[in-house]
Design a protein with these regions (language model features):
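Carbohydrate-active catalytic/glycan-binding domains of CAZyme proteins
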Residues: 1-279
């Protein structure tokens, strides 16, 4: 479908469909909400603040779930660093007073030595078997504390307390090992190789910036990259073709056909994070 432009400032949008058929969008700076038209392509009300969060620090990524007469509001709080967490609040009315969960944060890494850190942006899902899980973002750190694989997706079980609150993994934080859900197996086929036989690049390839006109072309099962006068240490360097690093340990092989290089010119493979960090 064609994209629908919603002219509202904010990030982390999510859609909530209420029982009466009305549709809403939520955005950050706390949990702001506004109503959409029937096909969710137009904003038809002003944004209102539902709740600014329990932690009151950088609340974002709001999601709503309606269950057993309550509206449950999930938010990511604490910033995207080590203090990142998931909190939940609830109200009997969509735009009522939201009560913070007494068990907040319902997901947070409390051990700085564990590999999985920065847990947030959680969204609850229920399987066809009735089991509940929390899908959330996290970062796996290496020895110096950096998460070189970026933000990754994790899954942990949700249980519901006697007083009707959702808690994740029994409040033990993220699990490095978890029981496999009783669901049909879906195997993801990773596209690790590319012989450039198509007329387009696959979605595995990325550019840090929009390439120059004819800067990168596919021809005769080869990818042709036009040279640039700019080095990798500047944001003006545009003709850079990259693939995301998905594993801590990996091998990368490519066949390069290079023209004659003159003093000051470079051509080859790079391990690239940004214009300040590359090898």
């Amino acid at each position: 479908s064609k994209p629908a432009i919603i002219d509202e400032d904010g990030i982390d949008p999510s859609i909530f469909n209420d029982d009466d058929g009305r549709r809403y969008m939520l955005l950050n700076r706390g949990a702001r909400i506004f109503e959409l038209n029937e096909d969710a392509t137009k904003q038809i009300s002003k944004a209102e603040l539902l709740f600014y969060g329990d932690n009151k620090r950088a609340p974002e990524g709001p999601h709503l779930l309606k269950k057993d007469g309550y509206y449950y509001l999930f938010e990511a709080e604490g910033g995207t660093g080590p203090g990142h967490r998931i909190t939940v609040s609830r109200s009997r009315e969509l735009k009522g007073i939201y009560e913070p969960c007494p068990y907040n944060p319902i997901m947070r890494q409390n051990n700085p030595d564990e590999i999985i850190q920065r847990c947030g942006h959680g969204k609850p899902v229920q399987t066809q078997n009735g089991d509940w899980y929390m899908v959330y973002l996290c970062g796996r750190k290496i020895g110096d504390g950096y998460s070189i694989l970026g933000r990754e997706t994790a899954l942990d079980p949700i249980s519901w307390t006697m007083d009707g609150w959702p808690i994740v993994n029994n409040l033990k934080g993220p699990s490095a090992l978890q029981v496999k859900p009783d669901l049909p197996e879906m195997i993801w086929e990773d596209e690790s190789d590319d012989d450039f036989n198509n007329s387009y690049l696959s979605n595995e390839w990325w550019f840090p910036r929009v390439p120059e006109m004819d800067g990168i072309k596919l021809k005769d099962s080869q990818v042709h990259i036009k040279g640039s006068k700019y080095d990798l240490d500047t944001m003006k360097a545009k003709n850079i073709l990259l693939r995301r690093q998905k594993h801590f340990r990996f091998s990368a092989v490519c066949k390069l056909c290079m023209p004659e290089l003159y003093p000051g010119q470079n051509c080859g493979m790079t391990c690239y994070y940004d214009e300040n960090t590359y090898i």
